[in-house]
Amino acid sequence: MLAKHCLEEFKLDCQLRRLTDRTIKGYYNNTLNFLIYAEKHHGITEVEEVYTLHIKHYVQYLLSKKLTAAYTNNILKCLRAYFRFAIQEEYI
């Protein structure tokens, strides 16, 4: 499944779980930024193409931007939620 289509389903799932608009926006934007990075740097468009190594490269990229640890951890929390959803829905 296209990673961006999975993201749209993830957003809908978050809305159905009645998460706040702010939380949904954060999950969506942080995950979208990762997907854009993955496509640009690794040519990844399908959710099942993402491996742990790609996420590690993304973390390394975030660290190179001198972001705070709290902000970086928040991004990782969003990615964990997205991939947990993808596994739950058996897209991965």
Give the ranges of each region predicted by the language model.
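N-terminal core-binding DNA-recognition domain of tyrosine recombinases/integrases
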Residues: 4, 8-25, 29-92
